């Protein structure tokens, strides 16, 4: 299996497994009383259809009631990350019927989320009670892309203790002992002498180059300025 590179049918099948299969997996594991489902990107949006089917008690040949729709909305939260239209999956209605079956395709049509094609982001937006982008600017862009929805902004962050390299974590432990408990203490890193920062950076760089050598057999020179790009090589990631 592979994440990227398949055709449209392959991609839709992946998203069926993630969304509908994800809900089925949680139920099989005994998680029957979950109160909130958080979807990241539209790839998992079919989870809303699975929850709608649960709410109705079956896959009905009727329009879902407002009560059923609102019950699903109260339980779904959606985060959109992608600021360009190409990042929002759309699947032709005929393909949706082939993969999901006519009954489910008709249900999606009655939910007004399929007009010739199923827009996965639109599906997630329509049936989530709270939606957010991942920065103030991205929130603005998302509201412009999807003007019919209320989209908040929550700035992305990282878990500092996980992302700090071992040499820097050891340095912070020495000079900023509370940084793991409260990341705000990292603001005082500006007072660390530059010579110590450089020494720690070189230690981290050597660890990275040793890891590259272990993985590939290639020995890079630690005296050469080196840039890494830990993302997919796609235009909107702004590798330039």
Listing of model-derived features with the role each one plays in the protein:
Residues 1-240:
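Catalytic cores of carbohydrate-active enzymes across secretory and cytosolic contexts
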């Amino acid at each position: 299996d592979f994440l990227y590179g398949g055709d449209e049918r392959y991609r839709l099948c992946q998203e069926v497994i993630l969304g509908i299969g994800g809900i089925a997996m949680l139920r099989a594991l005994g998680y029957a009383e979950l109160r909130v489902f958080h979807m990241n990107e539209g790839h998992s949006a079919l989870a809303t259809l699975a929850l709608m089917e649960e709410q109705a008690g079956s896959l009905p040949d009727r329009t879902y009631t407002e009560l059923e729709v609102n019950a699903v909305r109260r339980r779904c939260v959606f985060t959109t990350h992608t600021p360009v239209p190409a990042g929002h999956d759309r699947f032709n209605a005929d393909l949706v019927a082939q993969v999901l079956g006519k009954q489910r395709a008709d249900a999606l049509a009655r939910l007004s989320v399929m007009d010739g094609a199923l827009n996965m982001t639109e599906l997630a937006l329509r049936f989530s009670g709270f939606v957010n982008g991942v920065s103030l600017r991205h929130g603005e862009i998302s509201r412009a892309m999807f003007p019919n929805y209320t989209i908040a902004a929550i700035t992305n962050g990282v878990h500092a203790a996980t992302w700090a390299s071992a040499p820097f974590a050891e340095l912070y432990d020495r000079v900023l002992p509370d940084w793991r408990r409260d990341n705000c203490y990292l603001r005082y890193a500006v007072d660390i002498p530059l010579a110590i920062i450089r020494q720690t950076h070189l230690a981290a760089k050597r660890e990275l180059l040793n890891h590259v050598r272990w993985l590939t057999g290639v020995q890079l020179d630690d005296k050469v300025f080196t840039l890494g790009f830990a993302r997919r090589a796609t235009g909107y990631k702004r590798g330039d």
